[in-house]
Regions:
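Nucleic-acid substrate recognition interfaces
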Residues: 1-246
Length: 246
C-alpha cells in the first residue's frame, strides 16, 4: 500500500520577502477568479481538464503564438511560469466549485442562502523544484527559494530549522518527495514536504486491531483517540495551541 506523509520545516526568522511573495500570489489568484467567472460558460464547454486548463492559460498569458485577452502579464510581470499555472489551477477550481454550488442552489428553488464567489483566498504557493526551489549544500540547514521582493523575482537563501532538518535527514533521506508548499501556522512560515512510501498492512484480524483516529477541529486543533474495533476508547488527547490560528 502506498501512503503519503508530510512534514513542515520551519523557516527561521530573517529578512526575506516571504510576505510579499504570498501577497502577490494571492492577488494573482483573486484576479484570475474574476476573469474565469466571466468566461466560465465558454470554459465549461471543454470537457477535457487539460484542454480546459490550456484554454484558460491562453486567455491570460501572451506567447509568440498566442495573444492574451486579459492583461495578467502586465499586472503580474515576470511571474514564474509554474507559479502562474498553480494560480490558474487554483482559480479554476474555485470558480468550478462556485458554479456547481450555484447550480445546486437553483435546483432547490433558492431555499437556502445563495452561494457567493469569494475572491479573497488563502491560497499557498508551491515551490517547484529547480525553477522555484533548490536544495542547499549537503548537510546545510538551508534552501533557495525564488521570491518576489516587490520589484522582481529573485533567488533568496532561506535558513531552515536545524531540528526539523535533522529529522528529515534521519527519517526521510532517499525517499521520493514532492515540491514543498508554503504554509503559515501561528505567525510562523513553514515549507511542507510530502513523501511517498510503500508499506505492508498488518495481517492482524480487524476485530483485534487498535487504531488511532485524528479529528481536525475548529475550536481545538485536533483530537487524537486510541480505540478498539468495537468502539472502546482506550485513550484520548486534545491538542490545542493557545496562540492565534491562521
Amino acid at each position: 500500500m502506498q501512503i503519503i506523509s508530510s512534514y513542515g520545516v520551519e523557516l527561521r526568522k530573517q529578512n526575506i520577502p516571504i510576505r510579499q511573495t504570498l501577497e502577490i500570489y494571492r492577488s494573482a489568484v483573486s484576479y484570475l477568479i474574476g476573469i474565469y467567472v466571466q468566461v466560465w460558460e465558454e470554459l465549461a464547454e471543454i470537457p477535457d481538464a487539460k484542454r480546459r486548463f490550456n484554454a484558460a492559460e491562453h486567455l491570460v498569458h501572451t506567447t509568440k503564438k498566442n495573444h492574451a485577452c486579459f492583461d495578467f502579464d502586465i499586472r503580474f510581470p515576470k511571474m514564474p511560469s509554474y507559479l502562474r499555472r498553480s494560480a490558474i489551477q487554483h482559480a479554476l477550481g474555485t470558480v468550478s466549485s462556485y458554479k456547481t454550488r450555484l447550480d445546486l442552489w437553483e435546483k432547490t428553488d433558492g431555499k437556502s442562502g445563495k452561494p457567493k464567489l469569494v475572491y479573497e483566498n488563502h491560497a499557498m504557493p508551491v515551490f517547484y523544484r529547480d525553477v522555484m526551489y533548490r536544495e542547499g549544500a549537503e548537510g546545510k540547514d538551508e534552501a533557495y527559494l525564488k521570491l518576489y521582493d516587490g520589484h522582481d523575482w529573485k533567488w533568496s537563501c532561506v535558513r531552515l530549522d536545524h531540528t526539523d532538518m535533522e529529522y528529515l535527514r534521519k527519517c526521510w533521506s532517499g525517499k521520493k518527495t514532492s515540491a514543498p508548499t508554503l504554509e503559515k501556522r501561528h505567525q510562523k512560515y513553514f515549507l511542507r514536504f510530502s513523501y511517498k512510501e510503500e508499506v505492508t498492512l498488518t495481517k492482524t484480524p480487524v476485530k483485534e486491531q487498535i487504531i488511532c483516529s485524528v479529528d481536525l477541529g475548529i475550536n481545538t486543533d485536533a483530537v487524537c483517540t486510541i480505540m478498539r474495533a468495537d468502539g472502546t476508547v482506550l485513550g484520548r488527547r486534545f491538542i490545542d495551541h493557545p496562540s492565534e490560528k491562521d
